[in-house]
């Protein structure tokens, strides 16, 4: 298990041929996230180079993929690339929080619904509250902690925290020591927890695929519906939440964005690929 960056370093080793001599499969998780990023371009280059060293099968995984032709093109230009798809028979249970207070016309704070948010997380053993920015995560975490008269075990998780602290929070969620975590996109991908009972999206999700991905954190099992509550922070976001909810119910996803390979990534790849070779001094 590795990342595109660490994989690139492995490909630069002098023993790369021996290192991957028994390789049979390469599995790319969350495939859709690599189509429009330099990390994706780097990964594609190294997979292609590794293929020239040792043939193997590439498997791409995604829960929110719409453009299957793009996925096939990214994995391989081979016409024999096959698509295997499945759809959950259990639809997610999505609601929009009904607060007794008026939704603000503007702003991005859920302060008007704090008591309702706290009441919801008290109903469930474990929950994740997704927000869209790190500042929102800090403010919401502090607000919930200040009103936490039931001593709910609440934590925070975002990319600006030290790696060791993030890993500790993730471990404590799995072990059941943390009952609620306020998080940004740092918990969107790559973590399979079957013990999360509720997901709350604070603010508009800013994308149907992102909402589906976040909803999937709850009850990460096949035959159990995921529970999600959307909490708009202003009137316009209320409309966005309605639209996002309807799109999920209709199985509608946005098209993935694809960008051509970056020349700076190509230059880096060429340089790293030849670092272990002795090059002639005369051109």
Model-derived regions: residue spans:
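Conserved small/polar residues in nucleotide/adenosyl-binding loops
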Residues: 275-283
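Helicase motor core with emphasis on the C-terminal RecA-like subdomain
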Residues: 1-4, 12-272
